[in-house]
Amino acid sequence: MSEELPPSEAPRPDEADAVDETRATGETRGAAQEPGASDADAWATACAEDLEAEKARRRAAYGPPPGSAAEELRRLVDTVADKLSGLQSPLLGQVAGPAAQQVVRQVVQQAKAAVEPVIERNPDLFDHLAAAGGELLAAYRSAVQNQERRWTTGDTAPKDPSDPRDLDERGTDGRDEGDGGTGPGQRIDLD
């Protein structure tokens, strides 16, 4: 208890010499010149540079990242429009060719005019639809994988009498059908 700790604002003995030298020479340090601040700035700068380099590497390897669903739909409409406009129709022959191309261009322009306002008003809707589609695809894939696993493993799972997929080869589930009575129900043996 006889030891007293210096107040927290007081410099440590090794820092006291540096503070005295600074005061003696008239140099001052700003808040940005503190050792911790410059280290943090250097660290942030290095992290930002690394992140930009990684993004550039991925763009070079995989191409530009996909945009929002609205942008992707807009690109799809433009691509389809370009392909349809450039098609030569062999069915219509040389006589109807220019007229048919004009009709196709007009239809494409009308489709673009109808789609653009919807995309502009509801860009988030397409992101939500894309997310919902991804969830549906995942659910479908899971169901198909489970069914394929069941088909390929030889059906070693225990049979559930209430599951219509588990009926035996005769199409029955093991319950007594009775004498083929007049009603649509099945006879249940209570004894």
UniProtKB/Swiss-Prot annotation:
Record's note on what induces expression: Transcribed at low levels from its own promoter. Transcript includes downstream gene glk. Expressed when grown on glucose or galactose, levels decrease as cells enter stationary phase.
Keyword Transport: yes
Intrachain S-S bonds: none
Family matches, as InterPro entries: DUF5304
Disordered: region residues: 1-42, 145-191
Keywords annotated in UniProt: Carbohydrate metabolism, Glucose metabolism, Sugar transport, Transport
Keyword Transport included in the entry's annotation: yes
Composition bias, Basic and acidic residues: 11-26, 147-178
Any one biological process term the GO annotation gives: glucose metabolic process
Quaternary data: It may form a heterotetramer of two glucokinase subunits (glk) with two ORF2 proteins.
Entry protein name: Uncharacterized protein SCO2127
Organism for this UniProt entry: Streptomyces coelicolor (strain ATCC BAA-471 / A3(2) / M145)
